[in-house]
């Protein structure tokens, strides 16, 4: 079995986002798997962060945008790790993706799909 030198980050909260960006900026290809429809985790629900009371969205939003735009990151939102096989340095991971009902590569964030469903 050939070795595919890539990294899997499970969880798209602020820690997973930071890990994915750090690894991608170091030249690794990163697969970021998040079980919810969007990344951001609990931090996306907060107004301010502790202990500095910095604006949570001001920290998180640029990082979320950077994940989507980074050529070394493949984002699989609304997905879960179903199985892990292999050995150290050569794993095979099965990811189960939930249906999105949109073509993600064509999405420009216009929210017209939400209007169609409401």
Q: Model-found features: residue ranges?
A:
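Short, structured interface segments
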Residues: 1, 94-95
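Beta1/beta-strand and adjacent pyrophosphate-binding region of the FAD-binding site
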Residues: 1-15, 31
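Generic structural signal for well-ordered, non-membrane alpha-helical segments
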Residues: 13-16, 53-60, 106, 110
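Generic hydrophobic/aromatic pocket-lining and core-packing "Φ" positions
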Residues: 20-21
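Iron-sulfur cluster-binding cysteine motifs and their immediate structural context
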Residues: 24-38, 42, 72, 85-94, ...
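N-terminal glycine-rich dinucleotide-binding loop that anchors FAD/FMN and/or NAD(P) in oxidoreductases
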Residues: 44-79
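A structured beta-alpha segment of the ubiquitous adenosine-cofactor-binding alpha/beta core
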Residues: 65-73, 78-81, 85, 96-108
């Amino acid at each position: 079995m050939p070795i595919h030198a890539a990294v899997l980050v499970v969880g798209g909260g602020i820690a997973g986002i930071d890990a994915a960006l750090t690894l991608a900026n170091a030249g690794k290809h990163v697969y970021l798997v998040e079980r919810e429809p969007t990344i951001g985790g609990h931090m996306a629900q907060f107004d301010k962060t502790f202990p500095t009371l910095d604006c949570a969205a001001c920290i998180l939003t640029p990082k979320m945008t950077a994940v989507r735009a980074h050529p070394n990151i493949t984002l699989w939102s609304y997905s879960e790790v179903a199985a892990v096989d292999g050995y150290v340095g050569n794993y095979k991971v099965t990811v189960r993706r939930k249906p999105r009902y949109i073509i993600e590569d064509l999405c420009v964030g216009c929210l017209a799909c939400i209007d169609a469903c409401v």
